[in-house]
Amino acid sequence: MKALPFPCIRPAQDRVLEALPAMDSILSDSGALRGAITDGLMLKDPSAAYYVYECSGEPGRVTGVVAICPVNVLTGSDEAAAESVDTLAAARAIAELKVQPRPVTLAYEASPVMDIILGAAKEGASLYAVTDPAGITHRVWEVKREDAVAAIRAMLDQAPEPTPADDPTYAAALAGAAQLLADDARTVGTYTGKEPFNFTVAALFPTAQVSGGAPQVPTGLLTHQIARF
């Protein structure tokens, strides 16, 4: 599969506990998000990175890698979900925000080597470690070092295409938002096929770890800008 490092909009490391409870407001529209970036509450990190994400609590600990994948990994989502009124409204809201609010959860066939690589990344200091009201702890490590990025990319390149493991309505809304933005770009004659909205940020979890239900990265913790605002 194709899964690449990406530039991220995320909470400032020292203000994450302030930012996460305010995400409904911060991500209410692009103006509010711009204000949070100006204020220093949110950080627009321009350098591409992979992120290792771990959540622990009941029923255990799950580790995944966060990357951007071509948005067509979301095609073939539940047709009923794709055509629902709620999905269409959510797609319009995401297209207007111009930011994907949280990674979509996908399952993939991980290799033992990938487990070792991600385990090594987790030996460093974490970027975030926060516990939510449900008692689940979310940890994130940023992977920017060239050799580590290359190792993760090589493993993901060898993996089969991932499968959806998220709410079908959310996955369909992301695909719908990408389509709306692509239609807009085609209308004005600027579409190239390389725009950020042609990619979706995904939390990739080993299939074996999510058979009983896949976790979700908290909204706003790792977001992906899909169009200029």
Question: What is each stretch, according to the model?
Answer:
Residues M1-P162, D167-F229:
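Surface-exposed, charge/polar-rich loops and edge strands
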